[in-house]
């Protein structure tokens, strides 16, 4: 069947993911291969000192992204999308979206980037004897309670961004287990919210007199492959303003960007892992057993089918690096040289590999925003050197590439060196890996492990959630998600692997020691520069 026939017969599957700077739609065929795509650029706003996206921006962004997909389908195949076999919605995890019983949002969406929840996260971590990160939805909820925010009494439903969009498209208040594990801890045995912690939380807030308990307002947890409702007539109109798309399409459980990244890199099996490196970064290692104790810098989440995952999440990754590359672009424009950004990135990234393995002593702190792993509530991007360091372009670029995964290294060193976690394969995806071989080599040095990158890595989470849509409608009886991906999607494709060199690993270790010692400078900058 051709792509055109797949679309016209309603066999195509749609995946849409809301990233922090881009909303992306991918249409796949029965072979699970992308056949069309659309996108929409967007940015978060800092309103009253909190990072947010407006409800209007969410819907206009979704509609523009879908319209862009329709345009691509029209241009490539000269047809319209009338029916679909399945739809999947995914988005940035965590954060706070609270609604009243009239479906009105009570306060502007508070995204994962907000680090104003320190008191709540610390109290809950102590209560649960479990690391509860600042950005988790339960931290945001409890912080609003601690702040005495009036809206809390009116909460009828609290969810994530993916859960919100799914609810509006289907009427179902559900969430995939992976995304739910970023709201509050999941019990891997029941694949549901940890019942003991739910009970403790309800006890903690009992004296405050709210008319709800936690399970009244949190979404129902679903596993990959479970029915999560169908596109309603109103939902179809909200997605496709042209009116071509028909209602009744089944949707898979909405997932978080961590889960879709695992799917897109075939890393849902135990002893596999993946690293997503873009505006923010995270590593996900699927564990064989629980860690021996909670660590503040390691979050425990799950795969979309409920296996336990150790996640190291960093708020900052490539934004500062991109800002420096942009500076070189401006210099090029000043000289009157035509600018091709792919060429600028390619030249600078590859030149970085000619620098010293330890960056010649140069250090970069890429903290556009706060970084909980290193204990910073706010960030100040900073480049530091001593007068006698080897200051040249290669070392300069290399230090910024190292910085993009430096915090990730600090967290993963605990997993590999202290918890002795074993991994057979780690796959990289995201913007850092666009320039062939460079980001891969840097990450391999950082975590002293071979890194694979697949050709499909650039498809990212939108393709991952489309695959979860495919799993909903195309999996065999009792076929696990790992088997479905292995047999029907990747079929032996493990991508291109780069192993770390001893020199790179030793150099990165020196760099990270300098980096840790210099954190006092970053802290001083946060405290003194406004």
Indicate where each model-derived feature is located:
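Active-site core segments that coordinate phosphate-bearing ligands/cofactors
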Residues: 2-8, 14-15, 81, 119-175, ...
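Conserved beta-strand positions that form and line the central face of beta-propeller blades
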Residues: 39, 111, 497
């Amino acid at each position: 069947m051709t792509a055109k026939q797949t679309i016209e017969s309603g066999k195509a599957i749609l995946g849409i993911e809301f990233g922090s700077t881009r909303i992306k739609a991918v249409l796949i065929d029965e072979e699970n291969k992308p056949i069309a795509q659309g996108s929409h650029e967007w940015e978060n706003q800092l309103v009253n000192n909190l990072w947010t996206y407006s409800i209007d921006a969410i819907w206009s962004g979704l509609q523009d992204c879908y319209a862009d997909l329709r345009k691509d389908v029209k241009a490539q195949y000269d047809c319209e999308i009338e029916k679909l076999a399945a739809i999947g919605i995914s988005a940035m995890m965590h954060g706070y979206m609270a609604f009243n019983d009239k479906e009105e949002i009570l306060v502007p969406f508070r995204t994962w980037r907000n680090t104003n929840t320190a008191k709540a996260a610390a109290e809950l971590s102590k209560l649960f004897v479990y690391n509860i990160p600042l950005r988790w939805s339960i931290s945001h909820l409890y912080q609003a309670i601690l702040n005495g925010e009036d809206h809390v009494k009116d909460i009828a439903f609290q969810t994530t961004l993916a859960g919100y969009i799914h609810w509006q498209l289907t009427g179902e208040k559900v969430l995939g287990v992976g995304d739910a594990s970023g709201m509050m801890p999941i019990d891997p045995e029941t694949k549901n919210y940890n019942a003991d912690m739910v009970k403790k939380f309800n006890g903690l807030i009992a004296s405050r007199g709210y008319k709800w308990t936690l399970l009244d307002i949190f979404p129902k947890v679903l596993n990959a492959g479970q029915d999560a409702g169908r596109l309603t007539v109103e939902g179809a109109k909200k997605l496709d303003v042209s009116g071509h798309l028909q209602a009744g399409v089944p949707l898979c459980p909405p997932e978080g960007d961590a889960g879709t990244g695992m799917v897109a890199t075939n890393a849902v099996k135990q002893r596999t892992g993946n690293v997503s490196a873009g505006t923010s970064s995270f590593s996900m290692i699927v564990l064989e057993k629980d860690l021996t104790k909670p660590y503040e810098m390691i979050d425990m989440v799950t795969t979309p089918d409920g296996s336990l995952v150790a996640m190291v999440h960093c708020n900052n990754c490539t934004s500062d690096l991109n800002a420096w590359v942009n500076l070189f672009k401006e210099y090029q424009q000043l000289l009157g040289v035509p600018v091709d950004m792919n060429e600028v990135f390619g030249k600078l990234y590859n030149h970085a590999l000619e620098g010293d393995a330890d960056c010649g002593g140069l250090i970069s702190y890429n903290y556009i925003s706060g970084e909980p792993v290193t204990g910073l509530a706010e960030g100040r991007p900073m480049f530091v050197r001593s007068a006698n360091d080897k200051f040249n372009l290669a070392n300069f670029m290399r230090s910024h590439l190292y910085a993009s995964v430096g915090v990730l290294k600090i967290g993963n060193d605990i997993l590999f060196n202290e918890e002795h976690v074993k991994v057979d394969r780690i796959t990289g995806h995201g913007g850092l890996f666009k320039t062939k071989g460079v980001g891969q080599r840097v990450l391999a040095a950082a975590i002293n492990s071979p890194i694979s990158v697949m050709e499909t890595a650039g498809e990212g989470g939108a393709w991952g959630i489309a695959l979860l849509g495919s799993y909903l409608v195309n999996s065999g009886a009792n076929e696990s998600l790992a088997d479905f991906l292995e047999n029907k999607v990747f079929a032996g494709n493990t991508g291109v692997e780069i192993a770390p060199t001893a020199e790179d690993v030793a150099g990165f270790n020196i760099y990270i020691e300098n980096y840790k010692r210099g954190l006092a400078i970053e802290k001083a900058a946060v405290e003194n520069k406004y």
